[in-house]
């Protein structure tokens, strides 16, 4: 199966593109999506601890993804 990962800000900059299709085994989790990104060229520049949304809803690392899902990887937000 495959999911489309939307990359924002520093994530898009590090991987050199705004999105990527990630092949995964059925039953994969959000954590496995992030692990797949960490194996891509440029991953050494990925910020830690992103916010993740699956189909426009915030997700936990343990949530399962399904074929065709849209996974958004968003940098952590800081403010003051």
Which ranges hold each PLM region?
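Ubiquitin-like/PB1-type beta-grasp interaction modules and other compact soluble beta-rich domains
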Residues: 1-79
């Amino acid at each position: 199966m495959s999911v489309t990962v939307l990359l924002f800000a520093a994530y898009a900059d590090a991987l050199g593109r705004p999105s990527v299709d990630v092949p995964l085994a059925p039953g994969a989790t959000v954590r496995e999506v992030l692990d797949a990104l960490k194996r891509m060229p440029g991953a050494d520049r990925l910020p830690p601890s992103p916010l993740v949304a699956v189909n426009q809803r915030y997700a936990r690392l343990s949530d399962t993804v399904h074929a065709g899902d849209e996974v958004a990887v968003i940098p952590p937000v800081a403010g003051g």
